[in-house]
UniProtKB/Swiss-Prot annotation:
Binding site for ATP: 7-20, 96, 152, 175
GO MF terms, alphabetically ordered: ATP binding; ligase activity, forming carbon-nitrogen bonds; tRNA binding
Keywords for the protein's UniProt record, in alphabetical order: ATP-binding, Cytoplasm, Ligase, Nucleotide-binding, RNA-binding, tRNA processing, tRNA-binding
Subcellular location: Cytoplasm
Example of a GO biological process term: tRNA modification
Catalysis performed (reactions): cytidine(34) in elongator tRNA(Met) + acetate + ATP = N(4)-acetylcytidine(34) in elongator tRNA(Met) + AMP + diphosphate
Organism: Streptococcus equi subsp. zooepidemicus (strain MGCS10565)
Identification of the protein by name: tRNA(Met) cytidine acetate ligase
Gene, per the UniProt record: tmcAL
Amino acid sequence: MTVTGIIAEFNPFHYGHQYLLSQAKGLKIVAMSGNFVQRGEPALVDKWVRAQMALENGADLVVELPFLVSVQSADYFAQGAVDILMRLGIDTLAFGTEQLFDYQKLSRLYSEQAEHMTAYLATLPDHLSYPQKTQSMWEAFAGLSATGDRPNHLLALSYVKASAGKKLQLQPIKRLGAGFHSEAKDQCLSSATAIRKHIADRAFVEKSSPNAALILRAPQVTWEHYFPLLKYHILTAPDLTQFFQVNDELASRISAAIRSVATVDELVEAVATKHYTKARVRRVLTYILVKAVEAPLPEGIHVLGFSKKGQAHLKTIKASVPLISRIGAKPWDQLTQRADTVYQLGHMDMPEQTWGRVPIRPGAMN
């Protein structure tokens, strides 16, 4: 039987995600971001609610990406997620993309030319951001042309690199409906960005997600719920460079801006440059928020939920893969758990995110 892996955030789950799951083959394993997502933001609703959404729409197993995989640049995000999915026995990786290319061919190219392609990146001028350099690399070696407003395609190219040299079939699925960043309300399939933007419009959410009731019932948070705590950490930290990926220049820019801004968006605008993208700045601010430092990734894989098929699959691999189904006195990943504690502070009704939580199953949160 085909075992398909999907890397996702489901922030929140919408009809485009439902379509992606419907097109994936065989047993479907989702490696999902936890309570903070790749572009450096708190998830709108918590990871347990999002796992429930996935399971109710065809996923068989949902596992959590550790914090230092979830909140990373595209290449590290992709590599960490693919590594986890490979340990869970996938043979296919399905992903949505704005452009359908022969990604399998691109993966073979990268496995053969990785050294030359990496060397090419080093020759590009420093004023270019890493995403811009990556686009230039693919254009030079494969004739691809993509723009920065097609993030699913750029992530797909990171999946290509992460799967190079592995026995993994790539299944690109054409993204339908609104663009990734679209805030429009008049699209047949609205984006997660639009749902987050218009979350107060109940009718819009109900027409945009098969799990609207779950989304609307759950405590919802945004970056602004955490700005006072972030500001406190910035103002009281003896040295911001102690935190993950905060260099001297970023520390200086953040410290200089923090007293004159009133929101996270204003802080991001003040700190970002052509070299430091807004997404990178948001990730750095997330690291400061949760006091993240460089640490090894956990050996165990945290299971958020499963169907009967997913449970049967877990039984076939549990002897070779350390699976974490309940976090108690012994931590799974201290940094992820600290991030969960911070996340809980964003809403007074936010349920416990770690201690005593067990994998959910379809229908368990009705």
